[in-house]
């Protein structure tokens, strides 16, 4: 039996360098990158790099040998090689100016088919939904791009079409659960087939080209190429699950013969689909929402897991109420407000929405409609206002969805300072810093305590205390006067029943002596009993134990150092990493608390300054009025 040589087995054979993989696949570096992105193959980090690199100490990009062997059988490899042949032949035709042959070759351009790769990477539909977050975020980003050097216009238009189709499904299924506004964009989270899908829609700013090539658009466009095929499959499956026609279509009642439809019906339909404000055509006649079947709670209580099932039932009822949160409300979006995110949210929760027809096509009613209940405005004031509606800022819609109830609109009126916009994607039971507003959401009793920390409440308490002292002084004076009147009447008429005071005093003294003798006898008996009981049982007075915080902290530090010494040498790096993470969290929490204290102090100072200025203005006005009265 031959003895195996070094690096012929084990970890050295499990990994292969990128250069060796390129030689094995006979591909260029760009084609290899494209193939790895499409197939989902990525570099690996070995446990022992020196062994994996067969004794070499330089850092190389390594892949699993099985992954490279897996790429050898991929049909796309032949298509990528055909690209190389096509480039050579078309370049030759272009050089000799054989345009007839060049036109024929361009018609036979080799295309990559990715359908089998999507089915291979996602065997089930749930697997595709789990990987939908990055897909949607990237496609929403590319849908906002203009035509660039490495991003053709057809790709951006395809991203726009697929994302609009997905948003129509979210609206029709009412599967939206959480929303949030941040610097990056608008966060949305939907629950589809029991899976939570989260994506980001960027803010609508004009595109600004970058002078430096910090982002590799070529690599990103390869991801987009795969994700467009994946989202197309997903949309097809989702639409058929709701009995919606795919591609999305409108009922024939909408396509009436008018000037817009007669000019170009396809552009009319595409604009209305992009408006997200119309119901889509269904393959079945029934358009009513499916009601949840009633569950017999008595039957559930017989089961061992009845509490868990009842909790699930309560959550389902809460989600059913959330899906109709804006039902019966009519919204109108002003020109300065971003239209698309608000239309998605309002229509996903059963509301009706419209906007100015000059902003975008698809508006259903005008601003002058008297049945509008809420108008969303993002400016300090309006020239004309209607009494029958509430003028609110856009944050009200997002906060209502996150708190799953219709909030009062007085904090969101025009020109009002908005309350903090809290993220619904954080854990309420986390150990890090929690803002006081978020604590007040979970415990409403904290709202009052937080409000009492302002200077206004302090001044109100001081004023109330002054009023109480004045009232007490008046009450004491009245009581003193009544007492003096009563004593004067008593002396004048010789007691309440006309009895002489001296006789009454002698009788009282005689009775008092008898009572005092009896009381002394009782006290003697009690003292005897107490002395007998003390002999049987004695209790010593306790002492208050004062906790020394410095000694307590020192004991904790010593215990922590002892734990650090007891850690095994192979686990010390992990222990240090955990300690660093803990220290960074504590530092971040301390910084946030300090920042919040500074903000609260600034707001208090601003309130004090406003009050002082108001008092000065009132005093000046009173002085001016008095001068006018004297004149």
Swiss-Prot record:
Annotated GO CC locations: nucleolus; nucleoplasm; PeBoW complex; preribosome, large subunit precursor
Protein source organism: Drosophila mojavensis
Residue ranges annotated for the BRCT domain, each copy included: 321-414
Sequence positions bearing Phosphoserine: 453, 457
Entry keyword Transport: no
Segments of skewed composition (Basic and acidic residues): 525-536, 553-562
SMART domains on file: BRCT (SM00292)
Name by which UniProt lists this protein: Pescadillo homolog
Pfam families found in the cross-reference section: BRCT_2, Pescadillo_N
Source species taxonomy: Eukaryota, Metazoa, Ecdysozoa, Arthropoda, Hexapoda
Coiled-coil spans in chain: 510-541
Annotated spans, Disordered: 450-469, 489-569
Listed SUPFAM superfamilies: BRCT domain
UniProt entry keywords in alphabetical sequence: Coiled coil, Nucleus, Phosphoprotein, Ribosome biogenesis, rRNA processing
Family: Belongs to the pescadillo family.
Basic residues composition bias: residue spans: 543-552
Subcellular location: Nucleus, Nucleolus; Nucleus, Nucleoplasm
